[in-house]
């Protein structure tokens, strides 16, 4: 862009829309995953088995599924901004209340309600990105937003470990819930629903962007029939099945990595810092894969290769035996490859579906993935209770990722014009 038309950094849509969305999802992801660091202490203090912890963790995803399609529909036809604002307030309050659970039933109910209010956030944000970024930008835009996932883990695990060490697991939930209540006000002030509504956007940038987005919408065509037909669109069904298989493995690994490392004899603070390594590598992979995907305007094979490699690395983790370094290396490679898929993966449904129904399709895809998320943590916990190790669980997780890659192969991506 020429110097005469360059806009101020604080008005740049990449910083404003994606920056605020990034922080929002960091807070969301910390509040949903910090329980992974608290599991060893909660099991000891509350007397809860690994399988029960896994079941309670899985209940988060049952709640998460409920609002996927309704939130996606509301984001498409009403307001993604307002839906996310409400969800942000509610999930922060529920996360705060986790500090006060005393029984298995209370923990299970708390995780379900937390999932209910976090459920629509990703779906609504993907719809918001669809309203703000062109097809040529979308994998990178999705990645800037979704890189919040590994960054949240990099931040949360060490911080959670330090708070746990000095103040206990209850204070960890309190300290990490409060920022969400404050950030809700920032979200309401900073975000505009569309470029047309953004008073802070440079007029020339606004005109150019609106023209490009309208041209892409025209190319995608109008939705055919009732929006509910989107639920059995071939690409939506294949992506939903793929995401189920992928997230079953990913969430199983994510929630139990701290426990796997803790069982090698490490302190909780050391576990917190080491558990930050896999998502840090994942953040780098997300950037590299997103740039490649946008440069080549190719989504499907970037997604498939990353997912298959992640499965292979999980299978290879069996070679590490009881070596802390070996386990960490293979889990880091697996998580890094898996996170690399996110940018192209979430660009696909916005490119194969008309804008008016994209939110519904994204909701189903995300909901199916998080149904897999109910299975993964529970299955890993059951295997740990029955066998005394996570070996079988990692094997099944690796196979699930490879099967997911095969499921995605028939998807047809629309050629870039």
Where are these regions (language model features)?
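Helix-loop-helix hairpin linking two adjacent transmembrane segments in secondary transporters
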Residues: 145-198
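Cytoplasmic helix-loop-helix junction between adjacent transmembrane helices
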Residues: 110-148
């Amino acid at each position: 862009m020429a110097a005469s038309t360059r806009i101020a950094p604080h008005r740049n849509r990449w910083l404003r829309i994606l920056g605020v969305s990034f922080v929002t999802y960091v807070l969301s992801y910390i509040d949903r995953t910090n329980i992974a660091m608290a599991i060893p202490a909660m099991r000891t203090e509350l007397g809860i088995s690994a399988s029960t912890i896994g079941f309670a963790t899985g209940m988060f995803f049952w709640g998460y599924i409920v609002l996927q399609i309704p939130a996606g529909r509301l984001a498409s036809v009403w307001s993604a901004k307002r839906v996310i604002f409400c969800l942000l307030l509610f999930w922060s309050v529920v996360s705060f209340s986790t500090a006060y659970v005393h029984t298995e039933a209370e923990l299970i109910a708390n995780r379900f309600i937390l999932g209910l209010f976090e459920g629509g956030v990703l779906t609504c944000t993907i719809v918001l990105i669809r309203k703000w970024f062109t097809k040529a930008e979308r994998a990178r835009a999705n990645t800037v937003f979704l890189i919040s996932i590994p960054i949240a883990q990099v931040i949360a695990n060490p911080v959670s470990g330090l708070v746990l060490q000095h103040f206990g697991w209850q204070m960890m939930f309190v300290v990490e819930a409060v920022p969400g209540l404050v950030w809700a006000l920032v979200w309401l002030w900073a975000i505009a629903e569309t470029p047309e509504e953004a008073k802070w956007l440079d007029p020339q940038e606004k005109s150019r962007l609106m023209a490009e987005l309208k041209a892409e919408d025209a190319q995608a065509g109008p939705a055919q029939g009732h929006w509910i037909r989107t639920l059995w669109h071939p690409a939506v069904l294949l992506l939903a099945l793929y995401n189920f298989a992928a997230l079953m493995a990913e969430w199983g690994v994510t929630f139990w990595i701290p426990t796997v490392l803790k069982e090698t004899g490490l302190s909780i603070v050391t576990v917190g810092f080491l558990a930050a390594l896999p998502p840090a590598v994942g953040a780098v992979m997300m950037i590299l894969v997103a740039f490649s995907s946008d440069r080549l305007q190719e989504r499907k094979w970037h997604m498939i290769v990353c997912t298959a490699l992640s499965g292979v690395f999980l299978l290879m983790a069996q070679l590490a035996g009881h070596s802390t370094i070996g386990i960490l290396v293979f889990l880091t490679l697996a998580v890094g490859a898996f996170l690399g898929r996110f940018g192209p993966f979430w660009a696909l449904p916005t490119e194969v579906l008309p804008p008016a129904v994209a939110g519904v399709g994204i909701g189903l895809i995300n909901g199916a993935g998080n149904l897999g998320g109910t299975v993964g943590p529970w299955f890993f916990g059951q295997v740990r209770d029955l066998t005394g190790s996570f070996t079988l669980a990692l094997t099944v997780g690796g196979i699930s990722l490879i099967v997911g890659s095969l499921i995605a192969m028939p998807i047809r991506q629309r050629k870039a014009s």
